[in-house]
Amino acid sequence: GGVSRCFYLNLFGLGVFLRVTQGRISHYCFSILGNAGNDAGKNTGNNGGNNMSEAAGADGRAIEFVCRACLASGYLGGINKLTSCLQCGSPRIVAHEELFSLTIAHLDCDAFYASVEKRDNPDLHDKPVIVGGGSRGVVAAACYIARQYGIRSAMPSWQAKRACPELIIIKPRMAHYSAVGSAVREAMSSLTPLVEPLSIDEAFLDLSGTNQLHRKCPAEALVALQQTILKDVGISVSVGLAANKSLAKIASDQDKPDGFYVIGAQEAPAWLADKPVNILFGMGKTSTARLAAENIQTCGQLLAAPEYLLKQHLGRDAGRITALARGEDRRPVTPHRAAKSISSETTFSHDISDKDELIAIADTLTLTVSRRLKQKDLYGGRITLKLKQTDHRILTRSAPLSPPTDKAHRILDEVITLLSGEVGPRKFYRLLGVGVDALQPAGGAGLLDLMDEGAQKQDSLEQALDQLYDKHGDAAIISGRRFAQGYVKPTKK
C-alpha cells in the first residue's frame, strides 16, 4: 500500500525498473534494451492526453511522468520513448521534463451544459446535442458529436439544425448547471484554497502547497482530481498545467475532451512563436484583425513588431500582450473574495424630477456597475435602485436579474422599470444610485439571451463599446440619452 514512485534508467543498454513505495524498493526488474529502448527524437512538449503513444525528454534528459490510469508516477532517465505505463501498461500518461515543478492549473469542464444533459439522460450519449434557444436563438453549448458537423457556440440554432437535421436541442437549465458547477468547484477546493473561478465551469488553481498538504505533486493531485470529478460528478474536465495562468489556460484548450496538457516555462517562448495571436488573453476579433492588417498573425511576429506599432493598435494593453506572447504572466491566482454587492451613485447639483434626466444619469451609473462586474468576472442576480428625496429620506426598490448578468443594457432595462414607478411632477430627488447583489462567478453567457438573436447583437455591441472604453477612457462614447441630458460622471464609491 501507499503512494508509489517508478524509476526507469537505461544503463549502457540495460533497462533498470524500480518501484519505490513508502521509501522502500517494492519491485525491480532488468531487461536488455534494443534500439526501441533509446529511440531518437526530441520532444519537450506533451504527449500526455487521452491518446498518448510516447513521452520523450529533449536530448535524452530525464523526464517526469504520471499515469492517468493507476496514478503511478516517476522519472525516466536515459530513455527517449515510453509507450505505456511501467506499472499498469496504460498508454494514458502525462510526461514532461518540468512536470513535477509546475504549480498553476486551469480546469475546464468539457462541453459543460451538454455534458450535464447527457449525464442526466444516458439515451443522449451517442446523439448530437446542443443547449440553447429555439429557432430564433443561438447555441450555448454543443457536445463533441455535434461539433463534428461544424456546430459551435453562438451559432444560430436554425443554422445548426440545418447542418445536422438529427440535432437534439435542449433548453438551458441554468440553476441546475450552477449546482453541478458548484460541485466541481467544491472538488477543486478540496485540493487547494487558491481557486479562482472564471465562470460556472472553469477555474484557475494554485497548487504550490500540495506536496506538503496531500503528499503529492500538483500533477499527481490533478490527475486524481480528474478521476474524482468524473466519478462523483459524472462529467469530464480537461486540465492545463503550466508555470502561470496564461499558459495554463492555453494548455487546457489543447487536449479536449478529458485531456491533460503541459506547457513548461522553458519551452513556452518557442511553443508560442508560431501560434496565432488570438490565443492570448485579451486578443479579441478587433485587435486580431488590426494586427493581421500589419501582417502580424503569430506570437513570434508580434514580438518582432515595433513597439510603436503595437501601442498604436493595442493601446495600453500592448505591454501586457507582449509579455503574454513571451510566455510571461505575473498575475497570481486570486480567489474571489465574497463581495456582497457592487454599486455606484451620484448626488445631483440640483433636485431632479424629470424622468428622462434621471434615466440618463442611471445610464451612466449602470455602465460603471457593469464594467466593475466584468472586471471582477462576476454576474449580479438582483438589481437595486436607490433614490434620496429632498427631505433626505432614502427610497430603495429591488428586482431579480434572471438570469444573472453583467450586461449594462440588461441592468438598465430593470432600472428603468423600477424608476418608472417613482417619478412624477412632484417627486424630486437629490441622489440616485444603482447596485447589484446576489453575486456569482460569471458564466453561462446569459443563457436566456442566447434564445434571442437581438439580445446577442446587443451584447456584441456592448463588448465593442467596452473595448473602446478600455482603450480611450469612459468618455470615449456617450449614449444618445446621456448626450441629450448632459454627460454626468458618477462619484466613486
Where does each model-flagged region fall?
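Residues that scaffold, gate, or flank divalent-cation-dependent active/transport sites
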Residues: T21-I32, M52-I200, F204
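Acidic, metal-coordinating catalytic segment for phosphate/diphosphate chemistry
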Residues: S73, P403-K493
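Long, highly charged, low-complexity intrinsically disordered interaction regions
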Residues: C217-K275
